[in-house]
Amino acid sequence: MPTVQQLVRSARQKITTKTKSPALKSCPQRRGVCTRVYTTTPKKPNSALRKVARVRLTSGFEVTAYIPGIGHNLQEHSVVLVRGGKVKDLPGVRYHVVRGTLDTAGVKGRVNGRSKYGVKRPSDS
């Protein structure tokens, strides 16, 4: 426990937290343009072809973003909205593409968890 005089001399240090998504610059989402759309493989023990995109953000960063859901319509020069959130089995992928906004279409035929994949409520007919 420091004395009052010690605290006068040098105040207590604030604990600084490091951000997990620096490219967003404290914004909830950022717009960007796809520079490359490709598939990559996850680390052991998983096996798949995960769809990812290299995105140039309006903040000036170029990041790798995961494209969630089954099937997508993204290609080079597509304008996308990017949010934070890493993919556990893809090293270096710390961002997600938001489905159903800008040039990104929602997931076709999705019935459950629609809000996460940009799908409107199906009409009852």
From Swiss-Prot:
The keyword Secreted does not apply. Gene3D superfamilies: Nucleic acid-binding proteins. Keywords: Chloroplast, Plastid, Ribonucleoprotein, Ribosomal protein, RNA-binding, rRNA-binding. The keyword Transport does not apply. GO terms for biological process: translation. Its main location: plastid. It is found in: Plastid, Chloroplast. One of its GO terms (cellular component) is small ribosomal subunit. With S4 and S5 plays an important role in translational accuracy. Located at the interface of the 30S and 50S subunits. HAMAP family: Ribosomal_uS12_B (MF_00403_B). Part of the 30S ribosomal subunit. This is Small ribosomal subunit protein uS12c. It comes from Oltmannsiellopsis viridis (Marine flagellate).
